[in-house]
Amino acid sequence: MKTSKSKFLNFVKKYPLFKNFYYFYNIYIRNYKFLNNGSQFGEEKFILSFFNKAHKGKFVDIGCFHPTRHNNTYKMYKSGWRGINIDLNPLTINLFNFARPKDININAAISDNEENKTLYFVDELNTQNTLEANHLLFLKNQLNQEYIIHGPQHQYS
């Protein structure tokens, strides 16, 4: 279910008193944490098998998306590793702060130049949220998919 279509969840996210329920829902219930967690293609399994079990490493996850679902560092975090998670979506960072408080979680965009950028949301939690409107047009033309652009939402500089 998309969060934006749920009247109950839209109510819950408006009131700070309920924000922890909203985060819990997005981390554990919505994404079936008990069935599907960790990276999409098992990248972290290779990294963990490369080091011995006692090794507690560090990581940087740029474009971290979600604390458990399709996340390349979730199993490393559960194994005692600690790191920095960076994403341009404020909701993503709030979810990381809730689920992974021992990490450093930063709401920022990474760029090779300093300029104001507009953030375009495809959906509240989506891997295609972007700073580039052209990227959404490319996806629409190449994949023949319709995207609703909710942005501009935030200005980054």
Predicted regions and their residues:
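Phosphate/nucleotide-binding beta-alpha loop and adjacent structural elements of enzyme active sites
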Residues: 1-157
